[in-house]
């Protein structure tokens, strides 16, 4: 709904994008299925420009919510504050739409720098270090080529082994653990970015 990234590029309209992965309803209630949401928003004022959602259950409801925000000229801050009836079979206390707004706010407020897979693909790998913050078991199932594994669940002292003369790109499966790792590293003086969407 709204304007796609491809169209924004074609129209040369500046935008940022946030990608989140969330459950269709409360995770403790049986049958929760993951959905993916991507929002495009203005880097100046956070105006919501477009949204996409992929999944099986509840995607239509999320797109309707975001369509209403776009139609009313709303922003990512409106996504953060959107409320709907809470019932575990239908939604979570913090809906994936809310989470998309929170991620976008983190980007605009400077709480964390994000990088897209397209930007990562074009980076000079000699100037970055890829750090997969998932568990060792998850890392063993596959990761981005050249990444090292320093689990967020492990000792935070492990992070001090990272070089400070390179940009650290952290990532996980969804983006949350990458965000936490990025915040920890930022507080220790590292130049760090989180891979958008995990």
Residue ranges and their predicted role:
Residues 1-6:
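Active-site lid/adjacent beta-loop-alpha segment flanking the redox-cofactor pocket in flavoenzymes
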Residues 18-19, 130-133:
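Short, conserved beta-strand edge motifs with alternating hydrophobic and charged residues
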Residues 77-88, 92-129, 136-169, 173-198:
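Rhodanese-like catalytic fold shared by cysteine-dependent sulfurtransferases
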Residues 10-110:
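Flexible, glycine-rich terminal cap/loop adjacent to redox cofactors
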